[in-house]
Amino acid sequence: MSAWWIAPLVGVLYACAAFLGVQISAAVCRNVQPFEDGPKGGQPPTAWLIGGAAFIGFTLALRGMAPPQLGLAGILTVSLVASWYSDVRVGIVSDYFTLFPLGALVLGSVILHDYGILISAIVVTVPFAVAALFSRGRGMGWGDVKLVALGGAVLGMQAAILAFAAACLIAVAVATIRRRRNEPIPFAPYLAGAIAFALTFSIL
């Protein structure tokens, strides 16, 4: 991928993927009401999501990521943007955005007899699942747990642990600054952002 126009083109395609994620998420959320004890509904930063996706695509192409991996990362972009949008909008992360891509990854790993993806997803997910269980979905929702599993499968165990530890610290810091430590907050944006950052800058 040495042609000068490749990276800008990939950036545009990733922006389109993000736009698709927004539209799909908006359609799924249209008839969904936020839970009373969940995060308050808000307005997702659509323009920033699309612009961020374009930057990620541009950066990945510039770093020489192979076309098949670029395609997979583009599909993941749809999922991450949709998860971010829905959690901010209605406080829920739909299974459509997490379990479908996770299932495809796990199925592929089983077919190839490469169980690293499955093991990474399980190991990384366990502490978040425990948190969701004990908080009864208030501090950590099950949609967040499934997004963590997807991140573990995509990034691998070590990178996912680092990324999600950073996401938790940033979420706590932001909640403290905003004086919302006792209120449920949309956590998917922090998780999705951590996955995107780790994927883009390869903390592997």
Language-model features: where?
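A membrane-topology feature that recognizes alpha-helical transmembrane segments
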Residues: 1-204
